[in-house]
Amino acid sequence: WIGTVLAFYFGKANFEAATQSYKDAIKTLTPEEKISRLAVKDVMLPVKDIVYLDLAEESDKPIPAILEYERFKPYNRFAVLDKNMVVKYMIHRGVFYQFLYNSFQSKETSTENQPKNVTLKDLLESNDEQFKKMLNRSVGFISISANLLDAKRVMDATEECFDVFVTQTGKNSEPILGLLTNNRIFQYAKV
């Protein structure tokens, strides 16, 4: 019976040592090692929780009205999706304000060009190269089977990218399944 007690005691000590070793190892993981262990599907904002603009329904809405939408008050980025839930644009609040300002400053200011009448469609169809560039950047795409480090790498490789959308295979022509923002990745990368 003494052997049984000693085996139990040392077995418990070994278990506690192993547990402590595991805890110490977790603490020493780098942020990249930590996020490489997290599946995108487990940490993304699911599509049902994404606040977005419906391209077909809202393209004729005045930009000032869009900026006043209650659902967007906490956000500085506006995802624009088509009827198939495919991302068309990610527009930063500042782009809207800059476009309104430019419309107001335009020498062709008329009743239609007054900022209160400028629509989302006007922005999307603008011939101004500055706005074309702003509308066609800053979004990445990744497969649902990827990990968070993969998402960070996509973000790092894309100029001024703050958002990575999750699709089935990572193609931008597919319906989105979720979203990872730079803030969300940073949150999970904290050690």
Predicted region positions:
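Glycine-rich acetyl-CoA-binding "A-motif" of GNAT/NAT acetyltransferases
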Residues: 86-90, 172-179
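Membrane-proximal helical linkers
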Residues: 8-45
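Canonical hydrophobic alpha-helical transmembrane segment
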Residues: 1-6
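Membrane-proximal soluble helical/coiled-coil segments
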Residues: 31-123
